[in-house]
UniProtKB/Swiss-Prot annotation:
One of its GO terms (biological process) is phosphatidylinositol phosphate biosynthetic process. The gene is PI4KA2. Residues 245-251 are annotated as: G-loop. It is a peripheral membrane protein. This is Phosphatidylinositol 4-kinase alpha 2. Transmembrane segments: none annotated. It is found in: Membrane.
Length: 525
């Protein structure tokens, strides 16, 4: 434990802000249980701090990536050599960092004394993809619209370096890398800008408007990739695929690309749908999706068959999906009828498989929704993939915020509308086998999440000073902790989750919100 003692001493010598910023833990880090078992003298905050960067670096995609070794080595120059020689992993890929850029930037915002700018610049020089993704996130961090009421005063010095870092990255590109960067960004800026161009158009003209704009965009080489899936090379835009999605203030659009795998057969072309939206601060979605990713890893670690899909956010990518609202535009029935149309008669293998997929995904998002409290859960924000699984998107209202000036009209902890209960509970009175399976999975998922309460809270707490709307009112961290009910026994917590499921069952406020969205926005209910 000598190396652990040394690191904890290092952490203890840093300002309090260091520990306040860092308390979030690696959900997959194999050392975490060992550290807790063998180091009773160290607080949870110390252990969280020890594993903070490990969390970012632990999403191993390709441990043979030589560039990764340089990235880690460069980062290790910012901490005492006696520590990094013994503790840190040395073979982690750049891609393993990129899934957590937003929190990574939050982490480094309090470490200016550790040559943050130099580290980011050196890392960007090792990989074009790393540089591109970093630039996208730096742009998201420095948008003037999101600076309100001095929200960034505490991070003013960090904000000051953002534009400089971006420019220095671009200045450091070779001519070939600069050409690649310019083509990639120009292409997707044109695609994304369509969302803004549609805003003044009447709804009935938006489909034609998307096609008209897409026809103007020309491919600029065969090396362009989807920003959230760098292994997917874009071959062509399906100009007829554009669909305007439902949103009160924006016009998100879904566009399908024909793509090939970077390392696969380039003749094997497949469709990949992406959602683009102009004018939104996506960092709140990133925060919600990090918690969802953490929950997914927790469920997997304890052997729970619960489904969550923490999609990527730059533009948002959710493959092979349609929103519930879109499904309603092509059929008069509810989910029960739609599932029969798509998967066969009730009782058939295909239907029951789809129902099971819907069940495990609904249970996963029930637990996530209880903790994150996402609102604005109209049918435009619920996607279904081609095997029946539910995916929640658009986390513009989480924790303490809700639409309509924080009316909190949607007061169920998660959405469980009448048509959803028809699939989950054929009996209609909470007596069916599938209903009991659903509730059982919700309980097991909630109990599993409670065991990692500090880690989940730390993930959210790290962004507390970010200026995000979800932290703008009330006591978001305190109320998040209350929803875990740490004072309860496991039995009491299980009963609490059962009551949450019962309360959400076809709740009138859920139906009422869907009706309001249908009347105001035309969102199919």
């Amino acid at each position: 434990m000598e190396r652990l003692n040394e690191l904890c001493d290092i952490i203890e010598q840093n300002p309090k802000q260091f520990l306040d910023k860092l308390p979030w833990i690696c959900q997959q880090c194999p050392q975490s249980k060992l550290l807790r078992a063998e180091s009773p003298r160290f607080s949870q905050s110390h252990l969280n701090a020890i594993l903070a960067v490990t969390r970012i670096l632990s999403k191993i995609v390709d441990t043979t990536d030589e560039n990764a070794k340089f990235v880690v080595l460069d980062f290790l120059q910012t901490v005492p050599k006696s520590f990094h020689r013994s503790f840190w992993p040395y073979s982690l890929s750049l891609e393993s960092i990129s899934a957590f850029y937003c929190s990574f930037l939050g982490y480094v915002s309090c470490l200016s004394q550790l040559m943050v700018e130099g580290y980011l610049l050196r890392a960007a020089q090792r990989s074009d993809i790393f540089a591109h993704t970093l630039i996208w996130h730096l742009q998201g961090e420095s948008v003037e619209e999101i600076v309100k009421d001095g929200a960034f005063d505490k991070n003013a010095s960090f904000q000051e370096i953002l534009s400089d870092v971006r420019q220095h990255i671009v200045d450091g590109f070779t001519p070939k890398a600069l050409n690649f960067f310019s083509r990639e960004f120009d292409f997707f800026e044109k695609v994304t800008s369509i969302s803004g161009a549609l805003l003044p158009l009447p709804k009935e003209e938006r489909v034609a408007g998307i096609r008209r704009e897409l026809e103007k965009i020309k491919m600029q080489g065969e090396d362009l990739y989807l920003p959230t899936a760098p292994n997917k090379l874009v071959r062509v835009i399906q100009v007829d695929s554009g669909i305007p999605l439902q949103s009160a203030a924006k016009v998100p659009i879904m566009i399908t690309f024909n793509v090939v795998d970077l390392d696969g057969d380039h003749n094997d072309v497949k469709p990949q749908a992406c959602i683009f939206k102009v004018g939104d601060d996506c960092r709140q979605d990133v925060l919600a999706l990090q918690v969802i990713s953490l929950l997914g890893d927790i469920f997997q670690a304890v052997g729970l068959n619960l489904y969550l899909f923490p999609y990527g956010v730059l533009p948002t990518v959710v493959p092979n999906t349609r929103s519930r609202s879109q499904m309603g535009e092509t059929t008069d029935g509810g989910l029960y009828e739609i599932f029969q149309q798509n998967y066969g008669l009730v009782g058939s293998t295909t239907f029951e498989t789809a129902r099971a997929n819907f069940l495990i995904s609904s249970a996963g998002y029930a637990v996530a929704s209880l903790l994150l409290q996402p609102k604005d859960r109209h049918n435009g924000n619920l996607l279904f993939d081609d095997v029946g699984r539910l995916v929640h998107i658009d986390f513009g209202f989480i924790l303490e915020t809700s639409p309509g000036g924080n009316m909190r009209f949607e007061n169920a902890h998660f959405k469980l509308s009448h048509e959803m209960t028809q699939l989950l509970d054929p009996s209609g009175v909470m007596k069916s086998k599938t209903w009991h399976q659903f509730v059982s999975l919700c309980v097991k998922g909630y109990l599993a999440a409670r065991r990692y309460m500090d880690e989940i809270i730390s993930t959210v707490q790290m962004m507390l000073e970010s200026g995000l709307p979800c932290f703008s009112r009330g006591d978001p961290i305190g109320n998040l902790r209350k929803r875990f009910h740490p004072e309860m026994s496991e039995r009491e917590a299980a009963l609490f989750m059962i009551n949450v499921c019962t309360d959400a069952y076809n709740k009138w406020t859920t139906a009422g919100y869907d009706l309001i969205q249908y009347l105001q926005q035309g969102v199919e209910k």
